Amino acid sequence: MTDKLTSLRQLTTVVADTGDIAAMKQYQPQDATTNPSLILNAAQIPEYRKLIDDAIAWARAQSGDRAQQIVDASDKLAVNIGLEILKLIPGRISTEVDARLSYDTEASVAKAKRLIKLYNDAGISNDRILIKLASTWQGIRAAERLEKEGINCNLTLLFSFAQARACAEAGVFLISPFVGRILDWHKANGGKSEFAPAEDPGVISVTEIYNYYKQHGYETVVMGASFRNVGEILELAGCDRLTISPPLLKELSESTGNVERKLADQGEIKARPARMSEAEFYWQHNQDPMAVEKLADGIRKFAVDQGKLESMIGALL
């Protein structure tokens, strides 16, 4: 009998949510996603030391200013790890823009273009890269501009339907709605500590977004992310893509049985609503206290880990 990871792959594109090259070799995903926290974790792996050394040497050659060297080395390290991962996957790597730029459209566009140039200089074409941006209004506007210039984007830290709708209307390539962090919030702020997979608030959110996109003919890819258990993953079988951590990939690969399709495009197309204004976006997003909290919290956490990464690099300069 087949294992559940193999069965899931018949329904959904499986993406690895890690910067660990060993995990890529083991699970052979189509694509891979990284973020500042995963880059920080990957930087602790001894085999990656040469990638750090290369990034530092490159940064020293770019500027004599120490602060600029730290920023340059951080960018180059993220790309170096991405380059190693791209050797092992047929698809795309997602590399994230500094979370501290999440409310600055111009700076986000500039950082995205810098990351793309580093990949291009290493011989990697744009069709193998996704630029990750937080799903703030400013991040979505940055993505809209980048998409028009042939730079595909992955909009992350997505918790509200308003964020999902704004991303679709901006024509972004892919969104990453966070399943597990939605569940975390409801466990911490509600009277319920356990949810069946079909009743999981994160699963319900992604299902709603997926159905809305398909019903309105949006081409933006829906990639469920941030899973807490295999039940959430199986309940979203059929979603365009799912990005899964190595421990959960392992659990799926060690479980036998066929995975049942839960999400499907029914082929029904409805008229799209008028495009959201900035005021409508903020008002609708603000109606969801979970989304407001988790977006801000996610940006803060990624910014903290970016700072830790820069401190580590600074100590080596």
Swiss-Prot record:
S-S pairs: none
UniProt-listed Enzyme Commission number(s): 2.2.1.2
GO molecular function: transaldolase activity
Chemical reaction(s) catalysed: D-sedoheptulose 7-phosphate + D-glyceraldehyde 3-phosphate = D-erythrose 4-phosphate + beta-D-fructose 6-phosphate
A single GO cellular-component term on record: cytosol
Domain of life: Bacteria
Active-site annotation: K132 (schiff-base intermediate with substrate)
UniProt GO BP: carbohydrate metabolic process; pentose-phosphate shunt
Main location (coarse class): cytoplasm
Localization per record: Cytoplasm
InterPro entries per record: Aldolase_TIM, TAL/FSA, Transaldolase_1, Transaldolase_AS
NCBIfam families per UniProt: PRK12346.1, talAB
Homology family: Belongs to the transaldolase family. Type 1 subfamily.
Subunit-level organization: Homodimer.
Task performed by this protein: Transaldolase is important for the balance of metabolites in the pentose-phosphate pathway.
Protein name: Transaldolase
Organism: Edwardsiella ictaluri (strain 93-146)
Gene: tal
